[in-house]
């Protein structure tokens, strides 16, 4: 059974295409929009188009940034350690590290990981741009590359690939520690993580 | 900590204003929009504005309908019993009844219920429009009003108010049955519902 309005149906269909939004949620969102002032709908509509029109990738780190702020605020930031680059898979990972307010180096966003099964090879993600940043003529002051990809098979594969490419350049390659999360109980940690935590033990 | 793009922040803020969408979900939706082709964002943006611009209330039943389909498809539908009007609180309730494909009469959408605590009186919902439909000169063929408001205090109050207004017009006023839902187990039904079910028992 369909709504009595084609415009509402179209809105429900459009909402239902978003990830994690089913028909029922889409219907509730559509009814909410109908009840709100037009200004609210306009705000969301223009934010959608602005995000597509104004957001570009930073020419240095490939993270998302505004068209009029390229290079991005992190790449041009004062007090950033220009000699360390943390390599991540996607922009949300940059946000996660920035929230810690602990890491002070730069980033490089690959926008994906090597995944042969999905047809994604080294040339499909921003590896070339990373190597470009490591060339001596580009300032050449990079001392360390921190690999911070997700602990999946594809992430590990990409880390291995990158380390083999970068090590010959005489730059230190590290990866973030795998171990038990803060606040977790040993009893409920999976075997793989426990093994990694044991392997990676440090002096007290 | 904020994203490196003001446009993305604006989109996250706009998404987060939707009901049931928190910051994390809004962030995921925004990243999804960034990865989709521009056409998808355009489709949602224009659906939002169309819903505000093209959707009006049916001049008869007050349900939502397209500007170019007023009176709505139900009010003008063939094979609809013009002598029964089901009074509901909101457009989603019409949809719920239409999904049953069982009820064949007309509807009247109040767009709210009387709720003195929220400052909503009888004049703030579409009661006047309902009474207008019951006037003899308006065709005057309405035989029965079915009250199908939600079983809340406000819904019951509104039902009582309507029944007192309409009964003097010589029109039958009924309300939908309260009882145990199909498929429920008696053991887990609350006392109020069980009492209503017992009161409303019918011959087998």
From Swiss-Prot, chains A, B:
It holds the Pfam family RecR_C. A zinc finger (C4-type) spans 58-75. Residues 83-181 form the Toprim domain. GO terms for molecular function: DNA binding; zinc ion binding. The keyword DNA damage applies. InterPro entries: DNA_Rcmb_RecR, Rcmb_RecR, TOPRIM_dom, TOPRIM_RecR. It comes from the Bacteria. GO terms for biological process: DNA recombination; DNA repair. Keywords: DNA damage, DNA recombination, DNA repair, Metal-binding, Zinc, Zinc-finger. NCBIfam families: recR (TIGR00615). Belongs to the RecR family. May play a role in DNA repair. It seems to be involved in an RecBC-independent recombinational process of DNA repair. It may act with RecF and RecO. This is Recombination protein RecR.
């Amino acid at each position: 059974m369909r709504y009595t309005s084609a415009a509402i149906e179209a809105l429900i269909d459009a909402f239902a295409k978003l990830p994690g939004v089913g028909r029922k949620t889409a219907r509730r969102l559509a009814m909410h929009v109908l009840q709100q002032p037009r200004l609210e709908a306009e705000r969301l509509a223009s934010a959608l188009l602005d995000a597509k029109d104004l957001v570009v990738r930073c020419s240095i780190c490939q993270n998302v940034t505004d068209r009029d702020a390229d290079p991005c605020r992190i790449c041009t930031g004062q007090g950033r350690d220009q000699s360390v680059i943390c390599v991540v898979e996607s922009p949300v990972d940059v946000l996660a590290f920035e929230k810690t307010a602990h890491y002070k180096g730069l980033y490089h966003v690959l926008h994906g990981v090597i995944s042969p099964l999905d047809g994604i090879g080294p040339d499909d993600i921003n590896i070339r741009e990373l190597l470009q940043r490591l060339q001596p003529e580009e300032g050449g002051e990079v001392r360390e590359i921190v690999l911070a990809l997700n602990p999946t098979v594809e992430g590990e594969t990409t880390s291995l690939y990158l380390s083999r490419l970068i090590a010959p350049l005489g730059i230190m390659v590290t990866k973030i520690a795998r171990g038990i999360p803060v606040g977790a109980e040993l009893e409920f940690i999976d075997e793989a993580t426990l093994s990694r935590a044991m392997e990676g033990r440090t002096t007290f």
